[in-house]
């Protein structure tokens, strides 16, 4: 499992996505403040419904764009998986099938937690972070 180091392109995409997410957070906080605290001398709320709706839509779009950049960065990380890619796809498919059939909520929580850990490891592009989540998910899938 030799993954290449994270590229500067991948890091740049993640940094931009982080910035867009932070901007969306700031927009949300400012919008909520405007809704709760009207301008001096104005009646509540301090923003019209149309303006609030437009700003909420902008917040959602910022988050969608950030998520798209995170996805692009993860795609770059996944491209370097080489031969592991098929093993990861197979294991993810097995996990998906188990998710469909699981009866116990605690097993569902544990399985999805392992799957999320593996997804995070893949997105990180760090080979040392991939082995443990892969093995844990594989063991969990086999135990169900």
Set out the residue ranges of the language-model regions.
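Membrane-proximal, non-transmembrane alpha-helical segments
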Residues: 82-97
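Intrinsic-disorder-driven secretion/translocation and chaperone-binding regions of pathogen effectors
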Residues: 2-6, 139-140, 144
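Membrane-inserting effector segments that mediate pore formation, membrane fusion
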Residues: 94-142
